[in-house]
Amino acid sequence: MQKGLILYMGYYGRYTAAYSIGCLLMLSLYIAGIFLHWAAFGVLLVLTLAGVMLLAVICSVLGTRRFNAAYQRFLTSCDAAAFLAEIRGCQRWQNRSTRPNLALNESFALQALGRGPEALEALSRMGMDRVPRRSKSCLQQLRLSVYTRQASIAIGLEDYAAARSQLAYLRDEVRTLPAGNALFGHFSKAVLDLEHMMAVQRGEPGGHTAYFRTELGLAPNSYLRAQASYYLACALLLEENDAAGAVPLYEQARALAPQLWVAARAGAALNALHAREAAQPSAGI
């Protein structure tokens, strides 16, 4: 039983250590009861087992909450380097249960830093064949997340053949979900996002300005606002040739996420716009 509970520990060594120490203390109490022939031996056994399980739940919840808080800080601050450092610290204590989520988040952080090949390598280290047996829905969510991340990275690397392949897998997997399922709504939206992003990067017009304007208005954090600002600026140039409208959006993307890929892309786009303006002949008087 203890091995199974330890398998689902949280992400941090302090909680694993607290669990181990607590288990040792309760085991010591249990052994003492055996040697001292306490009358309440049966009650002590039940309390020891209950204490072990309760401690496992508490430590797992605390570790998961702390990791989720680090993820939210990243989305708010766009400090991918700090989030990556947090993940690397957790990986020292990873197990079969925490490895998939850590690999997905490591891949996300590396992609945000513009390190696409390393992000793909992080996903490959996850090893779907080593993922523990879980419920069918958990495994399906993991597959959906991997397809989404691989498609997103491929788009960033401008490997559109790979992106289309991963999007096809993602669409096929989404079709197997019931329409009212929460995963259906989330990953159907992910498919739309990725399709619009890829089309904008490939220079294929098709209602992207309206889509990303809506995305920018609904973006709940700095990371998504920076991403939506960048793609809205690209869409304005593509569909409306609106350089005046694109410039402040590129600048906003750089200001929101100065250390991330989106800032580098926005900076390159601004430089290209300025070069184009400089190359245009000035109007005569």
PLM feature spans:
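Juxtamembrane interface helix immediately N-terminal to a transmembrane segment
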Residues: 1-23
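Membrane-interfacial hairpin junctions
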Residues: 29-47
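Helix-turn-helix repeat elements of alpha-solenoid scaffolds
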Residues: 40-46, 71-88, 111-129, 159-173, ...
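Transmembrane alpha-helices and immediately adjacent membrane-cytoplasm interface residues
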Residues: 44-74
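"A position-specific structural signal for the A-helix of alpha-solenoid helical repeats
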Residues: 65-69, 98-108, 112, 142-152, ...
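Flexible helix-coil transition and linker loops at the boundaries of alpha-helical arrays
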Residues: 88-96, 129-140, 173-185, 216-222
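Alpha-helical adaptor scaffolds
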Residues: 149, 155-221
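Long, non-transmembrane cytosolic or organellar matrix-exposed soluble domains/tails
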Residues: 201-285
